[in-house]
Amino acid sequence: MEIQNTKPTQTLYTDISTKQTQSSSETQKSQNYQQIAAHIPLNVGKNPVLTTTLNDDQLLKLSEQVQHDSEIIARLTDKKMKDLSEMSHTLTPENTLDISSLSSNAVSLIISVAVLLSALRTAETKLGSQLSLIAFDATKSAAENIVRQGLAALSSSITGAVTQVGITGIGAKKTHSGISDQKGALRKNLATAQSLEKELAGSKLGLNKQIDTNITSPQTNSSTKFLGKNKLAPDNISLSTEHKTSLSSPDISLQDKIDTQRRTYELNTLSAQQKQNIGRATMETSAVAGNISTSGGRYASALEEEEQLISQASSKQAEEASQVSKEASQATNQLIQKLLNIIDSINQSKNSAASQIAGNIRA
């Protein structure tokens, strides 16, 4: 029996040693993935629930580490695929693999590589599932941040509106009070002062008429016939009782009352104007107070928006890392299939060789 071989035996052993070294490197990467997965506790069941309490920094760091390791595994997988592709070219029907020089250790090495890749595929699948849960948790956190952002904006708007309306109402009430006081001063103090002024003017006019009448009237009293040229002297004119009462109660007291009412009117007017100014100033500051009360809500909304962006970034990185892990798992699966094909080819070659040997012995 002649079994063709395109590579020398020494070269085949060299390739097996190289693949063993690469398998050790892949074993180390698989251990790294298992260490990463150990930091993400999960409750495995029909509906797995993420129980991790990683903060944003830890999540970003974990995602970056997973992405870095996934890139390394992807490069190693591509290299392994190329090596196996080159090896598969030697397993065509025209160029059958020669197993006559292979020892049991070489076959065991190929089987160990297949087992190692199977474990790596399992770890990558588990890591991809865990990263998917992390991405879901980050997306859920982003949705909660959106809800809290809306509530903060709504509460700040309500607070600002209530504050502005309340302060405006206080200012309007103060202005209305000032206007009412000014109207009261006009109705009471100014009207009283004007009435007293009319009374004073009437009193003076009546007194002047009475004096003029007494001075110009002829004297018929017999006691004045003998006065001669002094009969019209002021000292000889007798005043009536009304005139004496007017003179005994001078108009100074009435003028004082008028002055008092005038001063009271002016004071009340100034007080009313002050209230109006305070009311207008209060209403003008209501907008500022409303903006200040609303700014707190806007600040809280901005914080929630920042948390939302962080959660979205974390979710995106976790999804990308999960996708890379799934792709690496698929590549590993393809590599395992090729190794299994190699093992199957070896078994077929061994069986064929055994059959030919048995036939030769019988012959």
From Swiss-Prot:
Q: Which spans does this entry mark as compositional bias, Low complexity? A: 17-30
Q: Please give the chief subcellular localization of this protein.
A: secreted
Q: Which Pfam families match?
A: IpaC_SipC (PF09599)
Effect in UniProt of substituting R362K: Increases invasion activity
Which residue ranges are recorded for the region named Disordered?
A: 1-30
Ranges that cross the membrane: 99-120
Q: In which domain of life is the source organism classified?
A: Bacteria
Phenotype when changing N347L: Significant loss in invasion ability
Q: Where is the composition biased (Polar residues)?
A: 1-16
Q: Which stretches of sequence are listed as region IpgC chaperone binding domain? A: 33-73
Q: What is known of its domains?
A: The C-terminal tail is required specifically for Shigella invasiveness, but not for pore formation. The C-terminal tail is responsible for IpaC/SctB-induced actin nucleation.
Complex and partners: The core secretion machinery of the T3SS is composed of approximately 20 different proteins, including cytoplasmic components, a base, an export apparatus and a needle. This subunit is involved in the formation of a pore, called the translocon, in host membrane. Interacts with IpaB/SctE. Interacts with the molecular chaperone IpgC, which prevents premature association with IpaB/SctE within the cytoplasm of Shigella cells. Does not interact with CDC42 or RAC1 GTPases in vitro.
> Which family is annotated?
Belongs to the SctB/SipC family.
Q: What's the protein name?
A: Type 3 secretion system translocon protein SctB
Q: Which organism is it from?
A: Shigella flexneri
